[in-house]
Amino acid sequence: MVKSYTVGGILMNYYEPLLLTPGPTPVPNEINHALGLPMVGHRSPDFEIIAKKAFNNLKPIFGTDNEVMILTSSGTSVLEASMLNIVNPDDHFVVIVSGAFGNRFKQIAETYYKNVHIYNVEWGQPVNVNDFITYLSHLEHTITAVFTQFCETSTAVLHPVAELGKALKLFNEAIYFIVDGVSCIGAVDVDLKRDYIDVLVSGSQKAIMLPPGLAFVAYSNRALQRFQEVTTPRFYLNLNKYFDSLQQDSTPFTPNVGLFRAVNAYADLINAEGFKNTIKRHYIIRDGLRAALRALDLELLVEDDFASPTVTSFIPTDKDELTHIKSTLKTKFNITIAGGQGKLKGKILRIGHMGKVSPFDILAVVSALEVILTDYRQTNYIGQGITKFSEVIHSEA
């Protein structure tokens, strides 16, 4: 569908939609091509070749030496799986809640378990590692595991996961450290051994730039042993089944064959760019966008040191301005961004910039914001945002 907007009496057409939500994200042509290839049997040598490549291709993205498990399901499924395969029914464990997806971990925990300890962090703030370790030291129970987000998608905070992992190891090396990386894996530097992470999960539709439908589990060797020991009932989400099948280059249940192929197409794209360059691109775009939003007098929710490289949240002047920005981007410029979630609904807007996103995509939304705010606030912002954005891209690239 063609969107049109009149500027100075000239009709401006926007033929291609620009999706800038924090998931799903735009899918590259190379991946769409892989999705369109002829179907093969999921219990055939053809699929075994595809699966083996996919399990191995994800290793550098997740910072692990172990083949990565792939489930045909949503990201929430592996949040649940990470808990059911680590925590026994009577164990005590901690969930860090700093936003809507930390709250999802909490909801999963309270569905299955009775000894759940919640550590609340102000939405928009990172977890303070020293304060959290002090909190653990005052608990009167032996803690089996700690669950946290890496990037809290609802606020755009990137938690200091490496620092937290090291601190947990020093505090009590027996504690399992489980990390939800759904909205940042593929755009950040992570290493399971270095960061003392036992389970790291993610989904296909964010920085890994596939359609929704696959979920991923990376694991330490001691976590793999723990999967075998845990008695919590589970069936489809029993990770032992996935590991056993992985050893045979297969899956325990019918997989999405096309998306497995797409994983390999994704890996080819990342190898061509160089994964370090992929990470750098995300951080440069983040810095440029933040500078541009400030130039447009839009307040940022998250401080610079803990800002995610995959999603940026900002605070319009009021709810009316928020509604106007979001709707006008869509109706007049064919650009889709996201609103707030949970307690931040109606208070912030979020721009996703992960996966198949270039500086030119962000220039489009920045220039659109200039036009929208100039009209709405009756203040001239034309050129201010794109100038700041371009300066950052030039200096950091």
Please provide the spans of the model-predicted regions.
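Conserved PLP-binding catalytic core of the aspartate aminotransferase-like
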Residues: 299-332
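Conserved beta-loop-alpha segment that forms the PLP phosphate-binding cup at the N-terminus of a helix
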Residues: 65-94, 98, 102-106
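Conserved active-site segment immediately N-terminal to the catalytic lysine
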Residues: 193-205
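Active-site C-terminal subdomain of aminotransferase-like
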Residues: 26-27, 205-291, 295, 397
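A glycine-/small-polar-enriched, mobile loop at the entrance of the PLP active site in fold-type I
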Residues: 16-72, 76
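PLP-dependent enzyme catalytic core of the Aspartate aminotransferase-like
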Residues: 6-11, 343, 347-397
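Active-site phosphate-binding strand-loop segment of PLP-dependent enzymes
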Residues: 127-186
